[in-house]
Amino acid sequence: MGLEDEQRMLTGSGDPKEEEEEEEELVDPLTTVREQCEQLEKCVKARERLELCDERVSSRSQTEEDCTEELLDFLHARDHCVAHKLFNSLK
């Protein structure tokens, strides 16, 4: 085993384009499952309520209202769906 072989082992194949292609192929399954779950009816309705709240709060200059409850409802609905689907896609 020569010095060149050791360098290839430490840095990979040595071809930066090849390394970039390998990195681009990796997709986080959590992101994919979240996107799928956000399309479900329950999540769509929760997101609509969140967006309506955001519009209402943003249109007022002085308000004590925030959209914490709507945000938590949306995240809960999405994460409930994700919890049931994510572990099936993991190896």
Swiss-Prot record:
Write down the superkingdom of origin: Eukaryota
Q: How does it sit in the membrane?
A: Peripheral membrane protein
Acidic residues composition-biased segments: 17-27
Answer yes or no on keyword Transmembrane helix: no
Q: Which InterPro entries does this one have?
A: Cyt_b-c1_6, Ubol_cytC_Rdtase_hinge_dom, Ubol_cytC_Rdtase_hinge_dom_sf
GO annotations of cellular component type: mitochondrial inner membrane; respiratory chain complex III
Q: Which cellular compartments is it found in? A: Mitochondrion inner membrane
Task: List every position bearing N6-acetyllysine.
Answer: 42, 85
Entry-linked Pfam families: UCR_hinge (PF02320)
Residue range of the transit peptide in the UniProt record, numbered on this chain: 1-13
Q: Which GO terms describe its biological process?
A: mitochondrial electron transport, ubiquinol to cytochrome c
Which pairs of positions does the record mark as disulfide bonds? 37-81, 53-67
Q: Which UniProt keywords apply?
A: Acetylation, Disulfide bond, Electron transport, Membrane, Mitochondrion, Mitochondrion inner membrane, Respiratory chain, Transit peptide, Transport
Give me the ranges of the annotated region Disordered.
1-30
Keyword set includes Membrane: yes
Annotated family: Belongs to the UQCRH/QCR6 family.
Annotated function: Component of the ubiquinol-cytochrome c oxidoreductase, a multisubunit transmembrane complex that is part of the mitochondrial electron transport chain which drives oxidative phosphorylation.
What does the subunit section of this Swiss-Prot or TrEMBL entry state?
A: Component of the ubiquinol-cytochrome c oxidoreductase (cytochrome b-c1 complex, complex III, CIII), a multisubunit enzyme composed of 11 subunits. The complex is composed of 3 respiratory subunits cytochrome b, cytochrome c1 and Rieske protein UQCRFS1, 2 core protein subunits UQCRC1/QCR1 and UQCRC2/QCR2, and 6 low-molecular weight protein subunits UQCRH/QCR6, UQCRB/QCR7, UQCRQ/QCR8, UQCR10/QCR9, UQCR11/QCR10 and subunit 9, the cleavage product of Rieske protein UQCRFS1.
| PANTHER family according to UniProt | CYTOCHROME B-C1 COMPLEX SUBUNIT 6, MITOCHONDRIAL (PTHR15336:SF0), UBIQUINOL-CYTOCHROME C REDUCTASE COMPLEX 7.8 KDA PROTEIN (PTHR15336)
Q: What is this protein called?
A: Cytochrome b-c1 complex subunit 6, mitochondrial
| Species of origin | Bos taurus
